[in-house]
Design a protein with these regions (language model features):
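Right-handed parallel beta-helix
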Residues: 1, 25-36, 47-63, 76-92, ...
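Short acidic, glycine/proline-rich loop/turn micro-motifs
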Residues: 9, 64-66, 142-144
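Gly/Ser/Thr/Ala-enriched C-terminal appendages of enzymes
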Residues: 105-220
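Active-site-proximal segments of catalytic enzyme domains
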Residues: 7-9, 18, 58, 82
Length: 220
């Protein structure tokens, strides 16, 4: 919990990031509740890999609602897994940063009362999987963000949405060699990427867990 001035609902003179990791590998963040942080619950930097964040809840952020605030679960690393996490009143609830090498997976995550889109908030964060990610009140964006944050341009390529929901799901492909896709997704759908079974259910329910079971067996 980040201690703040209770009389100021937009106080920022308190802790911004709860967990900030860099130069780290083979780590876990598990079953943590985060409250009142202005920036991130978990912020994984470029030199992080093979990190799992699971079963965490972040809510009641205290901050302004612009800039780089409330990027709640964000990775700039590679081979990171964020699963079964909940973010409330975040701006970018589940996000990847500038040129995150990937692959990075967000699996069975929920954004409640979201104030901004989830997806990559930086340029060319390739190899994202959004698998059963539900964003209440905002969007999931795989597209050209143009001048967002000083000229982000294309935010991702070779990425996939699988059974996701949101206000609007933007899924565009930069070109024929860098294709994004969306399968079994619900909401207002837009983009030139590959779409299958839109506003319908697909099997398996979770692509990530199906591949994990195939690789490791049901005990995984």
């Amino acid at each position: 919990m980040s201690e703040h001035n209770s009389w100021n609902p937009k106080d920022e003179d308190h802790c911004w990031d709860a967990i900030w990791a860099d130069n780290a590998r083979d780590c876990w963040v598990r079953r943590v509740e985060f409250r009142h942080f202005a920036g991130s619950a978990v912020n994984l930097q470029k030199q992080t890999s093979r990190i799992t964040v699971e079963d965490c809840i972040a809510g009641e952020p205290v901050s302004e609602t612009g800039g780089w605030r409330r990027c709640v679960f964000i990775t700039r690393g590679q081979q990171t897994l964020i699963q079964r996490c909940v973010s409330r009143q975040g701006i970018h609830d589940f996000a990847a940063g500038f040129c995150a090498a990937g692959p990075n997976a967000f699996v069975q995550c929920e954004g409640e009362n979201s104030l901004g889109f989830s997806g990559s908030i930086g340029s060319w964060a390739a190899g994202l999987l959004f698998d059963i990610v539900n964003i209440d009140g905002n969007d999931i964006s795989f597209k050209n963000l143009e001048q967002f944050q000083f000229g982000t341009g294309w935010n991702t390529a070779n990425s996939m949405m699988w059974q996701c929901t949101g206000s609007t799901l933007y899924c565009y492909s930069p070109d024929s060699d860098n294709r994004n896709s969306a399968h079994g997704c619900w909401g207002t759908l837009t983009g030139n990427a590959e779409w299958t079974s839109s506003n319908d259910h697909v099997q398996p329910r979770s692509l990530f867990y199906a591949q994990l079971e195939k690789r490791m067996g049901k005990e995984a």
